[in-house]
């Protein structure tokens, strides 16, 4: 390896920049499903529920294979593991572009894509940020904000590719993005610890803490961790129920598709700004204050969506990207920092891994649940009202947990 690359490998700013670029690709991947949902339905005639089930397989398979990713990381290191996952992900998207049936779509995009998408997942990047930086929430925000820019840039570009060619060509473009951006950055920069600061091997007495069964036992035995687990399940469920149907919702409310896509793409920029702002806020004022602000904005977002079809003008919709970002952009950063405060350090990796499994399950369940409700009712208002009730519950639970952590003197 050239000497200048070896120097870059140990420069924290370079690690943060690499994380930002990898999350840019993640934003293009995750943020674009709302666009593919509409395009695949129009091309194939499959129902929204059928297509959304592919996203469910994608997220759930990624969550269920997270322990394998952790084992591979322990055995071979993050750089080799993430590089290998990138190749699997690119293969999955390439095969998805050839899918001619829902089952083929589930196997390619869902299973291979879901497993491989961990190559640019926030879990590993947030772990890197926590080990490399003294202000971890700010570092996490800098990395995670790349996904917002990725969504902002990718949605208009992918829409043009879909209109000029097809959704299949757009999936091939995402596969190329992963190979060109994620693969080299993961292989070069994604070391879990700075040189010379690697943790010592665990003592025999702590090996059991790395077991999934021990993690489940720790969660079951602690009321605080049980509530944290519930929040990890419900929060991504509500976010992705909304996020996967944004374009369809705005079109149903009477907005032209190009305007709807532009509005959703704008959330990429507002998420970028929101994550940076919340990272600094968490480091400065703690997770309770940040969580309360997030809760108010999330509820306001649902209120706006419910009111929009009833209004004579669509002008209030232009507040949506700002409200949506304040209400939802900081979820991963908040949860990671809450976990660092509430989980015993001796068992952190295993317990937080179980939390991320629940998080992935919530991501998997949200889109098909929303799609099934919309398909069954033929409308968006009743499903959105139900999502709003769940959203209110889990935000209240998180704020209570955060205040409890603050009373124990933690931030």
Model-predicted segments: where are they?
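Cytoplasmic helix-loop-helix junction between adjacent transmembrane helices
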Residues: 109-145
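C-terminal transmembrane helical hairpin of 12-TM major facilitator-type secondary transporters
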Residues: 267, 271, 284-338
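Helix-to-loop junctions at the C-terminal end of transmembrane segments
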Residues: 65-77, 274-287, 374-375
